[in-house]
Amino acid sequence: PRAEHNLCSPDTAVVENALAFYSDIFRKMEIAGIRSIGGGLYAYWPVDYSREPDKAGDLERSIKNMRRLADIAERHGITLNMEVLNRFEGYLFNDTNEGLAYIRAVDKPNVKLMLDTFHMNIEEDSFTEPILQAGKYLGHIHVGEPNRKPPREGRIPWGEIGKALRQIGYDGPVVMEPFVTMGGQVGKDIRVWRDLSQGATEEDLDRDAEKSLAFLKGMFEA
């Protein structure tokens, strides 16, 4: 969400605008049969670090307003997954410990935790312990290599991650989130400054995705 949809803003007009923004999205999601949404819904992105963050105040406001948002989402049968972001992209919570503290403070059954191997690689000491720690609170997971290439092309221990997911009985979405080409607003916001695809065509990228999917199934279903 952009700054005008910031649930931790001290400006109540911004918060009300955010709630209206999400309410409209939830109505459309329900019509489309989509039951889950995730990301940095608790704040805004990309963060403006030119100003000193008010972490304590923003956390308090975010928790209070997330309870309101969760009630709205619940009426549409939607689960909200709070993504744990690395320190360069967010500040309210950067690891699983902080993320779980937030989830428990909000205390709504449709508010879950979302982990991402890219962010975990920066902030966590382990790839498996955060998954085991999240347990029943884990609602969504993003997967990708440390340089944001598709799974199988890097050094992340996918077999260990798959074992941890099976250990907690996770049966939710596993979504690949590669960013390998420059250009556009997404490329700018993600800071992709070189072509990581080695000049791949759309067809090449599709084949890479298929290979990564087969690889993950082998790692996660073993």
Task: Specify the residue positions occupied by each region the protein language model found.
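Active-site-proximal loop/turn and secondary-structure-junction residues that shape catalytic pockets
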Residues: 2-3, 41-45, 84-88, 117-119, ...
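Short, flexible segments with low predicted structural confidence
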Residues: 1, 44-45, 71-75, 137, ...
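Active-site acidic/histidine proton-transfer and metal-coordination neighborhood
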Residues: 7-112, 124, 199, 203-208
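Short active-site-adjacent helix-start/loop capping segments
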Residues: 4-8, 184
